[in-house]
C-alpha cells in the first residue's frame, strides 16, 4: 500500500499552532499564535491598493462581479473595507473602540453613511454571497498620495503614507497574502520612485509571486487610437523598473471591466447604444464623442439626457467609441456588448492572475505568512511567562522549512528577499526566481519535454551553485542561492527518475 500523501501545508502549520497553544498561557505570545491559527482558517486575503482616484474600488467591483464598493469620494473610500463570504449579506463597521455596528446594504451597495466619523472607524467588513469570496477575501483600501515630489526623502512621503488613511492602507498591505497595486500612468519612469514601491513590503511576506501591478485608466492615453497599444510600452517600462517586486504590470480599463463583469449593463442599454450608433456621419460622431458635455448635449442624438448620463457612467467616452464600433460590426444584444467590453478592458489577464495564480497557490502563500508570524512570535521578549514555549516553536518550524515536499515555502523566501531589495541578483538569476515562484507547477519552467527537461533543470542547479560558491557572496546570499539550487536539483531528480 502506498504511503498516505502529506497533509496540506496549512494543516501542518495549524497543527504546530495547536501544539504550541497547549503549552501557552494567556499573554502576548498566546494571542499572536491564536491569530496565526485563525488566519489559516480563512480564505487568502488579496489587498487592492494604489493612489488616490486610481480606480481601486472600480477594480474591486470588477473582481467581485457586482457593483458594491463605493467609487465616489465619501466615507467608504476613506476606510479599509474587507469583502468576505457570508450570509445574510451585511456590513459590519468595526470602531476604534472595538464596538461593531451592523448595517444593511443599500439596494445591494455600500451604505452612503457608516454611522460614525471615519476617524472612529478601524475597518469595515462586508459579507456577501459571492462565488469569488468562497476562495479569497478582497480588501479595498484608502488611496495613497502618489503625486508627491519624486525626490522626497522617504518612501512613506512618496506613497502618501502620512496620516491616518495612509497608515491604514500600509497596515492592510502588510497583512495581505497577495497584492494588486494600481499605478498611475507614468510616461517617464523614475527608477528611485518606482523602486520605493517595494518599501510597502516591509514587515510583510509579499513577493513578486504574490503581487501584480495594474496600469489603470489607460483609456485616457490615446484619443482616437487604441489605448491598450499605447499602454503596452509604458507597462513594459514600468515592469522592467519593478522587476523582482511584482510579477507583471497589466494595463486595465477599470470602468469597462466593471461594466463587463458587474451585471449592470442591460438590454435597454444595448438599445440606447444602437441609437448612439445611428449617428453615422463620421464628423457628427467625432463631435458627439469629443467630450462628455458634447455627448450629453448633442442635438442629433435621439436619446434622453438621463440615458446618455447612464451610458457615460458605465462606459465613459472611450467605452462609447468601442460600443459604436461594435454596433457597426454587428453587436446588438447586451451579451454581445459585454463580450466586447471585457476584451477591450484588458481585465482577462488580471482575472487569470487573481483566480488562477493567487487563489491556486493560496496554500503556499498562507503557510508562508503563518510561518513568518510564528517565527516572529518565537523571538518575543515581552512575554516572560511564555518564553520557553515560544522558543520551542523554532525547531519544528525549521523541520517544516527543510521538508523537500514544502520547498515552495523556501522559494517564496527568496522572492520576498528580492522584492524587499535585500537580495540583488544578475538578470539571468532574477529570471529564475520570478519563473520558479510564479508558476503553479515549477516543472513547467524548464519545459516538460522528454530528454530536455532534465538538462534544463541541471543547468539551473549549476547556475545557482556557481553563484552560491562565489567568495563575494554574503552568508545570507549563499543560503538563498542554495534554496534555488536545491529547487532545480529536486526537479532534475524527478525528471531523471521518470526517464528511468
Which positions does each model-derived feature cover?
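Charge-rich, solvent-exposed alpha-helical interaction surfaces
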Residues: 12, 16-19, 353, 370-373, ...
Amino acid at each position: 500500500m502506498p504511503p498516505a500523501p502529506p497533509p496540506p501545508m496549512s494543516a501542518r502549520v495549524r497543527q504546530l499552532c495547536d501544539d504550541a497553544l497547549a503549552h501557552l498561557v494567556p499573554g502576548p505570545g498566546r494571542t499572536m499564535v491564536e491569530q496565526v491559527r485563525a488566519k489559516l482558517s480563512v480564505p487568502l486575503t488579496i489587498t487592492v491598493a494604489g493612489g488616490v482616484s486610481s480606480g481601486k474600488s472600480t477594480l474591486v467591483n470588477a473582481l467581485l462581479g457586482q457593483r458594491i464598493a463605493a467609487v465616489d469620494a465619501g466615507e467608504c473610500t476613506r476606510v479599509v473595507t474587507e469583502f468576505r463570504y457570508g450570509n445574510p449579506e451585511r456590513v459590519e463597521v468595526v470602531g476604534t473602540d472595538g464596538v461593531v455596528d451592523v448595517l444593511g446594504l443599500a439596494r445591494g451597495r455600500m451604505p452612503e453613511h457608516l454611522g460614525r466619523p471615519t476617524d472612529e472607524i478601524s475597518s469595515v467588513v462586508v459579507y456577501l454571497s459571492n462565488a469569488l469570496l468562497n476562495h479569497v477575501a478582497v480588501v479595498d483600501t484608502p488611496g495613497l498620495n502618489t503625486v508627491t515630489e519624486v525626490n522626497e526623502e522617504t518612501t512613506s512621503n512618496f506613497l502618501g503614507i502620512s496620516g491616518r488613511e495612509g497608515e491604514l492602507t500600509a497596515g492592510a498591505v502588510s497583512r495581505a497574502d497577495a497584492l494588486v497595486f494600481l499605478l498611475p500612468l507614468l510616461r517617464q519612469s523614475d527608477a528611485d520612485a518606482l523602486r520605493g514601491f517595494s518599501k510597502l513590503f516591509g514587515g510583510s511576506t509579499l513577493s513578486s509571486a504574490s503581487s501584480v501591478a495594474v496600469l489603470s485608466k489607460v483609456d485616457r492615453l490615446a484619443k482616437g487610437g487604441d489605448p491598450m497599444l499605447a499602454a503596452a510600452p509604458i507597462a513594459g517600462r514600468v515592469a522592467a523598473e519593478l522587476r523582482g517586486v511584482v510579477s507583471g504590470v497589466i494595463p486595465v480599463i477599470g470602468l469597462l471591466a466593471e461594466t463587463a463583469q458587474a451585471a449592470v449593463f442591460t438590454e435597454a442599454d444595448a438599445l440606447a447604444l444602437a441609437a448612439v450608433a445611428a449617428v453615422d456621419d463620421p464628423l457628427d460622431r467625432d463631435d458627439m464623442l469629443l467630450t462628455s458635455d458634447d455627448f450629453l448635449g448633442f442635438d442629433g442624438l435621439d436619446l434622453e439626457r438621463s440615458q446618455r448620463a447612464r451610458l457615460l457612467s458605465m462606459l465613459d467616452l472611450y467605452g462609447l467609441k468601442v460600443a459604436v464600433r461594435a454596433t457597426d460590426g454587428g453587436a446588438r444584444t447586451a451579451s454581445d456588448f459585454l463580450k466586447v467590453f471585457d476584451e477591450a478592458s484588458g481585465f482577462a489577464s488580471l482575472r487569470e492572475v487573481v483566480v488562477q495564480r493567487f487563489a491556486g497557490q493560496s496554500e503556499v502563500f498562507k503557510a508562508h505568512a503563518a510561518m513568518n508570524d510564528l517565527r516572529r512570535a518565537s523571538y518575543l521578549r515581552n512575554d516572560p511567562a511564555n518564553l520557553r514555549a515560544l522558543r520551542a516553536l523554532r525547531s519544528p518550524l525549521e523541520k517544516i522549512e527543510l521538508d523537500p515536499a514544502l520547498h515552495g515555502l523556501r522559494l517564496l523566501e527568496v522572492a520576498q528577499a528580492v522584492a524587499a531589495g535585500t537580495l540583488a541578483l544578475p538578470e539571468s538569476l532574477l529570471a529564475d526566481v520570478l519563473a520558479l515562484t510564479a508558476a503553479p507547477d515549477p516543472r513547467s519552467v524548464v519545459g516538460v519535454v522528454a530528454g530536455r527537461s532534465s538538462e534544463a533543470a541541471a543547468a539551473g542547479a549549476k547556475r545557482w551553485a556557481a553563484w552560491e560558491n562565489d567568495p563575494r557572496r554574503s552568508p545570507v546570499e549563499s543560503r538563498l542561492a542554495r534554496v534555488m539550487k536545491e529547487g532545480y536539483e529536486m526537479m532534475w531528480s524527478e525528471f531523471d527518475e521518470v526517464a528511468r
